[in-house]
Each structure stands twice: as structure tokens, then as C-alpha cells.
């Protein structure tokens, strides 16, 4: 049976079925760890903090063979795959300043654990100062191959205007 978790503004932490995450200052970091055949679907809508708030960071998480640099007004999904599965992540972000650069797949995630014939897809949109919708496809290799990252193999396409974000919905399918 699918497990669902819906998170609104505020501070929270959870750990369930190998899924680690944290909500902080209206920002969000998701760190799913998939160790079975199946799929994980994350749909995150986040109202991000103002410029007076400190940068959000996912760097304090440990125990995952993944790395990210999460700066202010960013949303991070760091998957670790240990068997066949699919991860789909949809981001709707509202940035509160026009001086910020667009979020790119290379800033969002880098994977060091790999599975045969697994696809990692990031879809995200950003508004205020610029309008951008991107989709990055990443085909993960076998463990004998060098680590793959979104910055090495992803293409960013499309332009759109996103809705005002406010909540996060996470559904785990097994």
C-alpha cells in the first residue's frame, strides 16, 4: 500500500522506510533512499523564505552517497538507488528576488550510487524575475561505470510560468 506524507509550512523532521527529510523555514530538502524494486514520487510545492532569512541547506544530512550544494531558495532531491526503480520529482518554486539565478539540474543533484536501466527525472519551475521550466533526464549506469551526474548528461528545456507554491506532497510507491 502506498505511503503518503503531506507537509505544510513550519519545521518538521521525519524518517520512515529509509526516507530521510527535513522541513525548515518554509524550505524543504528531500533525501529518499530506495532499496527495493518500485518507484518513489515526490511532488513539492514550496513557498520559499525572504532574502532576510538564512540560506537553507541539506549539507547536514549524512549517510547517503550523494552530494549537493543547496544555496538560498533551492529545493534538493538526492536519490540513492540500490536496485531497479524509478524516481520522479516535480518542483514548483517561487523565488522572492529577481537577482537570483535559475535553479539548474546540476545544482539540484548528483548521484554516486547507480542501478542498471534506471531513469532519474527532475521537473522544476521557477518564477519572479525569470520564468523557467526544465526537465533533466539522467540514465544511471551499472556500479562498474563511473558516477553519473545530472550536470554531465541532462538537457534543460522549456519555458513556463508557475503557480504560487505553498505545500509539499510526498508519495512512496512500493
Curated annotation (Swiss-Prot):
Source superkingdom: Eukaryota
Gene: LINC00269
Organism name: Homo sapiens (Human)
Protein name: Putative uncharacterized protein encoded by LINC00269
Amino acid at each position: 500500500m502506498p505511503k503518503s506524507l503531506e507537509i505544510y509550512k513550519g519545521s518538521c523532521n521525519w524518517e520512515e522506510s529509509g526516507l530521510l527529510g527535513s522541513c525548515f523555514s518554509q524550505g524543504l530538502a528531500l533525501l529518499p533512499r530506495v532499496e527495493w524494486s518500485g518507484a518513489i514520487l515526490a511532488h513539492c510545492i514550496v513557498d520559499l523564505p525572504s532574502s532576510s532569512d538564512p540560506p537553507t541547506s541539506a549539507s547536514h544530512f549524512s549517510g547517503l552517497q550523494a552530494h549537493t550544494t543547496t544555496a538560498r531558495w533551492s529545493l534538493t532531491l538526492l536519490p540513492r538507488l540500490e536496485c531497479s526503480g524509478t524516481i520522479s520529482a516535480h518542483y514548483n518554486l517561487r523565488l522572492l528576488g529577481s537577482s537570483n539565478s535559475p535553479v539548474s539540474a546540476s545544482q539540484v543533484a548528483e548521484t554516486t550510487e547507480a542501478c542498471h536501466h534506471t531513469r532519474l527525472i527532475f521537473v522544476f519551475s521557477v518564477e519572479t524575475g525569470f520564468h523557467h521550466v526544465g526537465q533533466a533526464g539522467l540514465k544511471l549506469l551499472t556500479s562498474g561505470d563511473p558516477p553519473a551526474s545530472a550536470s554531465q548528461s541532462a538537457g534543460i528545456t522549456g519555458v513556463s510560468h508557475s503557480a504560487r507554491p505553498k505545500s509539499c506532497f510526498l508519495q512512496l510507491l512500493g
